[in-house]
A protein has these predicted regions:
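N-terminal twin-arginine translocation
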Residues: 1-10
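Cell-envelope/glycan interface and biosynthesis
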Residues: 8, 14-127
Length: 127
């Protein structure tokens, strides 16, 4: 990923704020410092983005946070990410699949590679 390589080369420090819409928790985390991922920050994000139905976290793909940070920077938003869905345990995913055809059987949410969010000050079409 070119953006990740640029971050290391530039020595970026990246901080994001997550507001989970189901748990109502808000967390501000520095996940990258001097172009390197910060383990403590990633652990906090893993917990903040856990399956809220089971309180089960997973190791989220840290590149997901790079993409989210880039989106926020590109659109110029200063609002927290309002997270609707992040990690889903296989059991939660199965339950949601029974309720909706829109839930993928092999959802990236189960792998820690997806996060559904919106930025309150940015039209979704712009994201």
């Amino acid at each position: 990923m070119r953006g990740t390589q640029d971050a290391i080369a530039n020595g970026d420090t990246r901080t994001i704020t997550i507001r989970h819409m189901h748990t109502k928790e808000e967390t501000t985390v520095t996940f990258k410092r001097d172009g390197r991922y910060v383990s403590e920050g990633l652990e906090k994000l893993n917990w903040a983005l856990r399956d809220w139905r089971t309180d089960e976290p997973i190791r989220m793909d840290p590149r997901l946070f790079d993409v989210a940070w880039e989106v926020q920077r590109t659109v110029g938003s200063e609002q927290p990410f309002h997270v609707v869905s992040a990690y889903r345990s296989p059991g939660t995913n199965s339950m949601l699949r029974r309720r909706s055809r829109a839930v993928a059987k092999h959802s990236q949410h189960m792998l820690g590679k997806a996060m559904d969010f919106y930025l309150p000050d940015t039209p979704t079409a712009r994201i």
